[in-house]
Protein backbone atom coordinates (compact mmCIF):
# COMPACT_ATOMS: atom_id res chain seq x y z
CA UNK A 1 0.00 0.00 0.00
CA UNK A 2 1.42 3.38 -1.02
CA UNK A 3 1.75 6.03 1.67
CA UNK A 4 -0.96 8.66 1.70
CA UNK A 5 -0.17 11.84 -0.20
CA UNK A 6 0.64 14.74 2.12
CA UNK A 7 -1.89 17.53 2.43
CA UNK A 8 -0.79 21.15 2.09
CA UNK A 9 -2.92 24.14 3.02
CA UNK A 10 -2.05 27.18 0.90
CA UNK A 11 -3.21 30.52 2.35
CA UNK A 12 -2.80 33.36 -0.15
CA UNK A 13 -4.95 36.37 -1.04
CA UNK A 14 -3.47 36.81 -4.55
CA UNK A 15 -5.53 34.53 -6.83
CA UNK A 16 -2.69 34.16 -9.36
CA UNK A 17 -0.19 32.96 -6.75
CA UNK A 18 -2.85 30.80 -5.11
CA UNK A 19 -3.53 29.04 -8.42
CA UNK A 20 0.20 28.73 -9.21
CA UNK A 21 0.82 27.00 -5.90
CA UNK A 22 -2.28 24.82 -6.21
CA UNK A 23 -1.21 23.52 -9.63
CA UNK A 24 2.43 22.94 -8.64
CA UNK A 25 1.67 21.16 -5.38
CA UNK A 26 -0.94 19.03 -7.16
CA UNK A 27 1.56 18.08 -9.89
CA UNK A 28 4.00 17.02 -7.16
CA UNK A 29 1.43 14.66 -5.64
CA UNK A 30 0.07 16.74 -2.77
CA UNK A 31 -3.54 16.98 -1.71
CA UNK A 32 -4.16 20.75 -1.77
CA UNK A 33 -6.45 22.80 0.45
CA UNK A 34 -6.91 26.51 -0.28
CA UNK A 35 -7.78 29.59 1.77
CA UNK A 36 -7.87 33.21 0.58
CA UNK A 37 -7.14 34.98 3.87
CA UNK A 38 -5.76 34.26 7.32
CA UNK A 39 -9.15 33.91 8.96
CA UNK A 40 -10.21 31.23 6.48
CA UNK A 41 -6.77 29.63 6.78
CA UNK A 42 -7.14 29.20 10.54
CA UNK A 43 -10.61 27.67 10.10
CA UNK A 44 -9.44 25.23 7.41
CA UNK A 45 -6.33 24.26 9.41
CA UNK A 46 -8.42 23.48 12.50
CA UNK A 47 -11.04 21.54 10.52
CA UNK A 48 -8.78 19.58 8.16
CA UNK A 49 -5.43 19.30 10.02
CA UNK A 50 -3.12 19.52 6.96
CA UNK A 51 0.39 18.06 7.08
CA UNK A 52 1.93 21.46 6.28
CA UNK A 53 0.81 25.06 5.71
CA UNK A 54 2.22 27.61 3.26
CA UNK A 55 0.93 31.10 4.00
CA UNK A 56 1.45 34.63 2.75
CA UNK A 57 2.13 37.24 5.44
CA UNK A 58 0.29 40.32 4.20
CA UNK A 59 -3.40 39.38 3.88
CA UNK A 60 -6.76 40.90 4.78
CA UNK A 61 -8.56 40.09 8.04
CA UNK A 62 -5.78 38.06 9.70
CA UNK A 63 -2.12 38.30 8.69
CA UNK A 64 0.11 35.31 8.12
CA UNK A 65 2.01 36.15 11.32
CA UNK A 66 -1.24 36.15 13.30
CA UNK A 67 -2.20 32.84 11.64
CA UNK A 68 1.12 31.31 12.74
CA UNK A 69 0.79 32.62 16.30
CA UNK A 70 -2.81 31.39 16.57
CA UNK A 71 -2.13 27.90 15.22
CA UNK A 72 1.11 27.42 17.18
CA UNK A 73 -0.71 28.38 20.40
CA UNK A 74 -3.41 25.72 19.81
CA UNK A 75 -2.40 22.23 21.00
CA UNK A 76 -4.36 20.64 18.14
CA UNK A 77 -2.45 22.51 15.41
CA UNK A 78 0.86 23.45 17.09
CA UNK A 79 2.82 20.64 15.45
CA UNK A 80 1.83 21.52 11.86
CA UNK A 81 4.90 22.94 10.06
CA UNK A 82 4.26 26.40 8.61
CA UNK A 83 6.16 28.14 5.81
CA UNK A 84 5.76 31.90 5.49
CA UNK A 85 5.76 33.25 1.95
CA UNK A 86 6.29 36.98 1.57
CA UNK A 87 7.61 39.84 -0.51
CA UNK A 88 9.01 41.22 2.76
CA UNK A 89 12.69 40.29 2.65
CA UNK A 90 14.32 42.34 5.41
CA UNK A 91 16.09 40.50 8.24
CA UNK A 92 13.57 41.95 10.70
CA UNK A 93 10.75 40.36 8.72
CA UNK A 94 12.46 36.96 8.89
CA UNK A 95 13.00 37.38 12.63
CA UNK A 96 9.33 38.29 13.13
CA UNK A 97 8.31 35.15 11.25
CA UNK A 98 10.57 32.91 13.30
CA UNK A 99 9.50 34.63 16.53
CA UNK A 100 5.86 33.96 15.60
CA UNK A 101 6.68 30.25 15.29
CA UNK A 102 7.12 29.74 11.55
CA UNK A 103 9.25 26.77 10.51
CA UNK A 104 10.58 28.37 7.31
CA UNK A 105 10.43 31.67 5.42
CA UNK A 106 10.49 32.02 1.62
CA UNK A 107 10.66 35.38 -0.14
CA UNK A 108 8.81 36.35 -3.31
CA UNK A 109 9.56 36.01 -6.12
CA UNK A 110 10.20 32.30 -5.73
CA UNK A 111 10.52 29.16 -7.81
CA UNK A 112 7.56 26.87 -7.04
CA UNK A 113 9.68 23.71 -7.15
CA UNK A 114 12.20 25.22 -4.72
CA UNK A 115 9.34 25.98 -2.33
CA UNK A 116 8.04 22.42 -2.71
CA UNK A 117 11.53 21.06 -1.96
CA UNK A 118 11.57 23.07 1.27
CA UNK A 119 8.10 21.81 2.17
CA UNK A 120 9.21 18.22 1.54
CA UNK A 121 12.26 18.81 3.75
CA UNK A 122 9.98 19.95 6.58
CA UNK A 123 7.76 16.92 6.13
CA UNK A 124 10.73 14.54 6.31
CA UNK A 125 11.79 15.80 9.76
Model-derived features with residue positions:
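Active-site beta3 strand of CheY-like receiver
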Residues: 48-54
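Charged docking surfaces used in two-component/phosphorelay signaling
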Residues: 19-27
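C-terminal output helix
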Residues: 110-120
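Receiver (REC) domain active-site loop signature in two-component systems and cognate sites
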Residues: 59
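Short hydrophobic/Thr-rich beta-strand motif most characteristic of the beta2 strand and flanking loop
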Residues: 29-36, 44
Amino acid sequence: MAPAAPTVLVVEDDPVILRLLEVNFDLEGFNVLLAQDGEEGIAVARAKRPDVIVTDIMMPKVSGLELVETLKADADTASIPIVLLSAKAQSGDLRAGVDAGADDYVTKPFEPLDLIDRVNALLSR
